[in-house]
A protein has these predicted regions:
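Short, cationic Gly/His-enriched loop motifs
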Residues: 47-160
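Short helix-coil boundary/hinge micro-motifs
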Residues: 1-46, 74-75, 79-82, 138-160
């Protein structure tokens, strides 16, 4: 990516406060709930990247992520927190490593109440609601937890 594209990318990110907060993508969102970012190709065309993959490319470099998956430790499809430290939320790895991590965190059980409501359309709707809320009111960890990760605190009233 060129410097203009990198600057344009970071203009679409709202960083949550604190060392463990997500950095939320507030640009385009695809029908799967993941952010979308377009860059120019060398032949004058365009290529579309998922926003978290674009963040990993910016921080780690194209070679580091070629033929690898970029996955989320935070389970937030809008998170683009790529860092060269333990605070980063994105991991680079293989499909097999991602499946092991998925099982370890209990995401492999499709009957788990935390994940069973999160089909493709529901995930996209939640992501768009979180983007709208963040743009209107700023970063809100409770909304990240409820809308994207499906975590509802005891006694918490619904947003809508």
């Amino acid at each position: 990516m060129n410097p203009h594209e990198i600057a344009r990318f970071w203009e679409k990110v709202i960083k949550g406060p604190g060392p463990s907060a997500c950095w939320l993508w507030v640009g385009a969102i695809g029908d799967d709930g993941y952010g979308r970012f377009w860059t120019q190709t060398t032949d004058g065309g365009q290529r579309m990247l998922r926003a978290h993959r674009a963040a990993a490319e910016i921080i780690y470099g194209v070679k580091a992520i070629t033929d690898q998956l970029v996955t989320h430790l935070c389970d937030n499809p809008l998170c683009v927190r790529a860092e060269n430290s333990r605070e980063g939320h994105l991991l680079i790895g293989t499909h097999a490593e991602n499946m092991i991590e998925r099982e370890y965190r209990g995401r492999g059980n499709l009957h788990n109440p935390l994940w069973k409501h999160q089909g493709r359309a529901a995930r996209a709707t939640s992501a768009r609601l979180l983007r709208a809320h963040t743009l209107a009111y700023g970063y809100d960890q409770h909304q990240v937890d409820e809308l994207v990760r499906g975590i509802i605190m005891p006694g918490q009233q619904p947003l809508f």
